[in-house]
Amino acid sequence: MLADLFTAVRLLTVVPLGRTEGGRALRFFPAVGWMFGGLWLGIAWLAREAGLAEGTGALLTGAIAVVASGMLSGLMHWDGLADCADGIGVRGDAARRLEVLRSSTVGAFGVTAIVFVALLQVVAFSVILESGVWWGLAAAPVLGRAGATLAAGLREPARRDGLGARYSVRMSVSEILVATLPVLPLLGWRPESHTALTVATALGLLLAFVVPGPFVRRFGGVTGDVLGATIILTETAVLVAAAVVGGPL
C-alpha cells in the first residue's frame, strides 16, 4: 500500500518517490491532491502575511500559485490538457486523434486551452484569496485528482501500451469509495462553510464523472493525457465554484 502511495506521488509530482509502474497507485491520487492543496494554502497564508491578498496583489499571488502547482506536477497535467484540446480539434477518427496525443508539439487548440484555463485559475484563486473562501484552495486539487481516479477506475484505456493502460485498473464501488476518502477531511472545515463546500464538492464529483466522457468518445478510451486534462478541468471548475458560491473561512 505504501509503495502504491509513493508511486502515485512520483506519477503526479516531480518528487522522486516510488516506481513508475503500478496500476493500484490510482487509488491514492486524491491523497496526493493534498500536497497541491497544502501548497496553495501555504502560498495564500504567505500572501496574506505579506499584504498581497487584495487587488492586484491577489492576482499576482494567483499567478504565482498556478505556476507553483504546475511546477510541482512537472506541467504534466497541463500538457495533457493541451494534447486533449488538440486531439479534439483535429478532424479524423479515433486513431488520428491518438496520433495527435502522441505528438510533442502543441497546436492552436492546445495553446488556447492552456491560456484560457490558466487565466480562470488565476482569477478564481485571487477571488478566493480576497474573500477568505480558502477551503476552495484545498478542495480543488483533491477533487481534481479524485476525478482522475474515477476516470481511470471506471473506463477502459484507449490503447494497451500507454500511460492510461498502465494505471487504469477496473475498480469496484467499494474501492472507489475508499479511494475518495481523502475528500472527507474537507467536510471538517468550519460548519458555516458546509453549504458552500458541499455544493462545490458535489459539483467536483459530478464533473469527475462527466469530464472524461467527451475525451473517451473521441479517443476511444482513457489515456494519460485524458487523466491530466480531467485533473486540470475538474480542479478549475471547483476553484470557480468556490469563488462563486463563497462562504467564510
Residue ranges and their predicted role:
Residues 1-74, 78, 82, 88-90, ...:
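Hydrophobic alpha-helical transmembrane segments
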